[in-house]
Amino acid sequence: MTVLEIEVGDPAKPSRMDNLEFLIDSGAVYSVVPADILKKLGIKPRVMQEFHLSNGSKITREKGGALFKYKDRVGVADVIFGEKGDSNLLGAFTLEALGRSLDPLKRKLSPLPMILAVQRQAS
């Protein structure tokens, strides 16, 4: 299990950030941050998202966008407005936005090779 401190903020107000501890979960698609912290930072939910739990039940959570910062890396990714009982998770979309991947053996984030497909025109 890897837990790291990551800064979270509103992309529209990047000077205002909060430090939070996150469980790094590369198997989770989205990051989860407590709703009260996101709202305090000025981040507003945009849509509702349904999730299927391992026990077969479904839950619904609000989803918005947040700015994430880890050391010198900054990225914007979708974020789930966590409710009571939800863990702070840093998911795959946020890891990719930060250009990082989880090295589970060393329990740290490593640079993610960034690939860009470019179509070159023939001369």
Q: Could you describe each region identified by the protein language model?
A:
Residues 1-123:
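Pepsin/retropepsin-fold aspartyl endopeptidases
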